[in-house]
Each structure stands twice: as structure tokens, then as C-alpha cells.
């Protein structure tokens, strides 16, 4: 899958990460981390991820144990390279405050975390089609 579109999925729920990998790996090169600290290290290519690929987009849980999505988005906004990466924020809660905070911090989209894995796959592919390379096949880089 060397030519697959790379996505970073950030969530503290290992079950969610396993499910996300299972349903997304047919269309994307999936990378996962469990917290905001590791997400930033991956994106900034710092240890323990100095050779991490630059993801085409990020799927980010709003509520992580070490920092919130807006805090992570704020750090991304400080980097000319990283601020261009589209971020889809997911949350268990359908709270307007969470969506407003995520969008104000730079999230391109906010969705309630789907309960069905197929719905997750559809949401991620739709996000990529809308915010990634225009008209790109999600299984190939444009």
C-alpha cells in the first residue's frame, strides 16, 4: 500500500482503533496513536516517530486523556506544514460546545462518533472526498 493515502487515527479507545483500522485499511494506509502527545510527536516526526509518514488527513477524538482536540489543533495551527492537514474531529457527545470549539480551533469537520464501523468508514471516505485531494480515489494518492 505504498501509494495509499495515509491517515492518522487518534483515539484513547483501543477497541475503536482496532475497528477503525479494520474498516479503513482497505482504502487507506492507517496509522494509530492513543493520545494527543503521541499524535503531535507523530505529526511533528519526533521520537518515537522520527520516520513517520506525513498523513494526508487526521481523524481525531475530541476527548483524549492528556489533551483535547482544540489543544492539538492549536499546536497544528502553529506549523505552516501541519496546519494544512485536514482534521476530522469525532466525539461520543453531540454537544454544540464541542463542535464550536473544534471548528474554532481549525477542524474541517466534526461528527458524532458512529456506532457502526461501516458508518465510520463512510464518514471518513466522505471527509476525504470533501477535504482531501479533489476527486481523489481514497485508495490512491492524487
Question: Model segments located where?
Answer:
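Two-component/phosphorelay signaling modules centered on CheY-like receiver
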Residues: 14-34
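Acidic, metal-coordinating helix/loop segments flanking the phosphotransfer/catalytic sites
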Residues: 32-57
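Short amphipathic alpha-helix used as the core "switch/output" element in two-component signaling
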Residues: 70-83
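Short, glycine/charged-rich "phosphate-handling" switch motifs in NTP-dependent
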Residues: 108
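C-terminal output helix
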Residues: 115-125
Amino acid at each position: 500500500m505504498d501509494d495509499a493515502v495515509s491517515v492518522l487515527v487518534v483515539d484513547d479507545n483501543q477497541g475503536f482503533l482496532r475497528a477503525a483500522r479494520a474498516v479503513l485499511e482497505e482504502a487507506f494506509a492507517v496509522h494509530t496513536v492513543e493520545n494527543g502527545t503521541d499524535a503531535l510527536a507523530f505529526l511533528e516526526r519526533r521520537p518515537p516517530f522520527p520516520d513517520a509518514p506525513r498523513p494526508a488527513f487526521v481523524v481525531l477524538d475530541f476527548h483524549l486523556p492528556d489533551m483535547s482536540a482544540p489543544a492539538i489543533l492549536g499546536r497544528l495551527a502553529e506549523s505552516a506544514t501541519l496546519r494544512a492537514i485536514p482534521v476530522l474531529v469525532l466525539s461520543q457527545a453531540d454537544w454544540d460546545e464541542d463542535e464550536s470549539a473544534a471548528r474554532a480551533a481549525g477542524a474541517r469537520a466534526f461528527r458524532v462518533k458512529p456506532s457502526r464501523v461501516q458508518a465510520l468508514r463512510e464518514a471518513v471516505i466522505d471527509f476525504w472526498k470533501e477535504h482531501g485531494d479533489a476527486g481523489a480515489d481514497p485508495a490512491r494518492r492524487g
